[in-house]
Amino acid sequence: DIQVLCPSRKGELGTVSFNKKLQEKLNPPHEEKREVVINQIILREGDKVMQSKNNYNLPWSKEDGTCGEGVYNGDVGILLEIDKREGTLIVQVDDKLVLYTMESASELEHAYAVTVHKSQGNEFPAVIMPMFPGPPQLYYRNLLYTGITRAKDMVILVGTERTVYTMVENDRKTRRYSGLYYFMIGEAEHEKAEFEK
């Protein structure tokens, strides 16, 4: 199984663009494949999909009759069946058949290409990473390392040597200023004042 890993979702080399193009090539429309549009995304039988957030209530079953609930952020599977009359989709995730309603299917996204961030915790036999110039806050050493280490057997870097060099040299992740530190200090001071009353 080959997985394309991108630094971001947006842009010409982001997952949104790649997924559209890869779906067209790898799973084009066919009269025998049912499809449905959810969140402006065409989901088609045979699509490679990923669960976008934890859902502890999605029912699943296994071939041996075992049943349970729960599918997790980052789980990848194949969309096997769309039943528009019943309003359900069946996705095979590893050895489980997961039953989605049209509403819960909004938690699915294409997984022909995923972000490096979203791929964390997964391994793939082969990884392809587009390596073209982009924003420095997305192109840093740890991102490259994370992407490469998702591959079990093979990594293919497609793009420019310069981009790879830039990523290797960029060992600083952009600092984010969320205000969380100041919020936590304020909360701690408030709690201390309440405690001392």
Where do the language-model regions lie?
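Conserved helicase/translocase motor-coupling segment
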Residues: 1-71
